[in-house]
């Protein structure tokens, strides 16, 4: 839906980047902060860089331009770090080419090509940071081609079409697997996935009624091979070779409406149908959606939603289907073929011009398929149930013209309904974040953020042969000092993560987007636009 413009396409924003370059990253501005208020023909150059301890460095460079009805963006992104321990390194390169052509206000075409290659060690997130493989290595390569079009035959109608093709390969080897009890064991594997997805959507806006309807089709073929060598003390005299081929097809259709009712109420209704054919699970499901947004007074918004979803492959985490219902997220990184029911309620409150606060709580019940192997070599697919409760409360305040304060509390509890489930761990986490930013007239911006985490859970202990309870409670402080260059050229900042070098045991929910740094780390960053 975006009109033709001069905003650069950042290669890094299309990827789930490694944690070392994103944790505590609230100071770094996005490139669109330097965009002009009015669109003019011409070229733009945007760049950013980072350098720090543990061999950390990276850069992002983008050239973009606008000439009448044609716009383009060329970008590259590079990052590397040695991490906080042995074999915790990451090296990644991303290249992006984007073009958009709009011969008239009613019609627009766009195309994008992305290439990503990465090499990593054992960067898996475990509650015990001392448990890792010193020999695990992984190399990945992904090519993505995306095309899209928008046609608006009338002011109340929009028609969208999108197509994505992706080719993904990975190779991994581990000469000392963490989860293998046999000395001298080794594992080597390779995999490739070729997939494409096509989607179409129609959007209609009739004053008090907005309607969205669409459909999509995905086809994916994956080939995997693995060699298991249990070593001289293993149960088998030689290596075991495993070859697997899997094909997935997914067809979905959906319709959503947003209806404005009297009393400042907006009602959201929806229905999606999903047909999923795969080796692990076949599904045919209808998923109802319902949401309500009510503004009983100026500055007050009350939200509620209930809906069911079916997890499917999303190439590059992209889809035309609406991802939220009344502000509640629908799609997560669940295993393909999972089903979930989520319901929740929330409130957002604005007080004057200096305070924004709110809270929400929701429940999400999941059914997750998992393939399990039997001693005779056969395998079966079992369905495991997990109940998750999440809560959030926040307050953003600007008590003074140059002072901004933030407070946020987050809660999450995952409760598997079966014992010794292989797909989820009993886990309860409380997280509190307190932050302050001061904007001085000379261009300096000191910032500080304090994060408190209290986590308890049941984790599998290989030496004990079962699950044991573990937890930790700790504080982490991050600080930064930024400087805004004259004439809005850019910013420069120095950032110190985990100021007091706090040691802790914490299980990340998303290992590639860590909320806290494992150790003290000093970084310098810059962003510039010309």
Predicted region positions:
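Surface-exposed extracellular loop regions of Gram-negative outer-membrane beta-barrel proteins
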Residues: 119, 125-128, 228, 233, ...
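Transmembrane beta-strands of outer-membrane beta-barrel pores
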Residues: 49-53, 67-69, 78-82, 115-119, ...
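Structural signature of Gram-negative outer-membrane beta-barrels, strongest in the C-terminal barrel
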Residues: 203-218, 242-356, 361-362, 397-400, ...
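Gram-negative outer-membrane beta-barrel transporters
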Residues: 260-266, 357-370, 381-461
